[in-house]
């Protein structure tokens, strides 16, 4: 009976509610990856919003040529592909040692696959528009973006949440945080 009570106490001791409040310094250490990731993700959000707003309105932003608009969309695709490649090769394997959310075939990597299924179609369409093979139609562009927009935005938020201080402190020490690949 004593072992059951000790195990119950140990379980309670590791719940987030029972963790001591982080000092501002500790919070910065534990939240550093979330802050860094959010900088990248905010750029993706800004670019997505510009592209999606134009597609929804049926017109490019004022003063932007067709070529600039299409190239902006292609850069978004290239940057997101590169971002996910870096995560999957250099960051997720380190995090996956202790954090289940970053392991293969779990939520975050599954989201990458779902995003890229739509992103690849979006990119192929823009490449066809850039080459002159297709004419850019904003309704088509919006429909392509709608295929992966929800999972993309969910992923951008989920990843930062997983890297947040309150979650990271469950798995890593401050010393380990200082050695992270970001």
Identify the residue ranges that each predicted region occupies:
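Small-residue-biased structural context
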Residues: 1-182
């Amino acid at each position: 009976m004593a072992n059951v009570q000790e195990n119950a106490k140990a379980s309670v001791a590791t719940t987030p509610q029972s963790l001591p409040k982080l000092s501002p310094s500790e919070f910065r250490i534990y939240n550093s990856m979330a802050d860094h990731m959010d900088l990248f993700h905010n750029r993706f959000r800004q670019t997505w919003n510009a592209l999606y707003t134009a597609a929804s309105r049926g017109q490019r932003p004022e003063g932007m040529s067709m070529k600039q608009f299409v190239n902006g969309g292609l850069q978004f695709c290239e940057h997101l592909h590169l971002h996910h490649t870096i995560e999957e090769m250099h960051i997720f394997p380190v995090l996956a040692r202790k954090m289940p959310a970053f392991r293969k075939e779990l939520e975050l990597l599954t989201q990458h696959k779902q995003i890229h299924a739509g992103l690849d179609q979006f990119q192929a369409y823009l490449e066809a528009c850039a080459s002159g093979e297709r004419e850019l139609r904003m309704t088509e562009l919006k429909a392509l973006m709608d295929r992966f927009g929800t999972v993309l935005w969910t992923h951008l938020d989920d990843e930062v949440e997983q890297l947040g201080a309150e979650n990271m402190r469950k798995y890593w020490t401050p010393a380990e945080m200082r050695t992270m690949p970001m």
